[in-house]
Amino acid sequence: DWSSDVCSSDLSTITIALSSFIGVILGGTLSDKWVQKNIRGRVYTGAIGLGLTIPSLLLLGFGHSFVAVVGAGLLFGIGYGIFDANNMPILCQFVSSKYRATAYGIMNMTGVFAGAFITDLLGKWTDGGNLGLGFAMLAIIVFIALAVQLYFLRPKTDNME
């Protein structure tokens, strides 16, 4: 039935887009206030956002209900919005203004390449009937990225000159 396909794709798009917008507003506001009290506030805020994507990936992988899928979309959108709102501000804590465009370009390019790789991988998992397990495995990768972020990102200033 075509109407269920349209409704489900529209619902997922709206869910993730709206929740990402909420995440951007929440993440930006929290980060701007937190960094005034703790120089790692932006890093911690980004980590909270990244952390929210972990249960969303697990829900996508193992959830079998409408509520689980919508909940996963909400968590992913809010988490990704919080994380994404803080990428450039965190970059500014480490990279001089002379090199920010280059650094941000490299960061974006890396994200595009990772997205292409993951899309291909998700396609293979889908073909093999293992998409749910694949999403759960992505949660492990995100957890490792979160640990790396928290361990290595130790800014000395809010704005590297």
Residue ranges and their predicted role:
Residues 41-44, 121-141:
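A membrane-interface helix-boundary motif in multi-pass transporters
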Residues 24, 92-128:
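A late C-terminal transmembrane helix in Major Facilitator Superfamily
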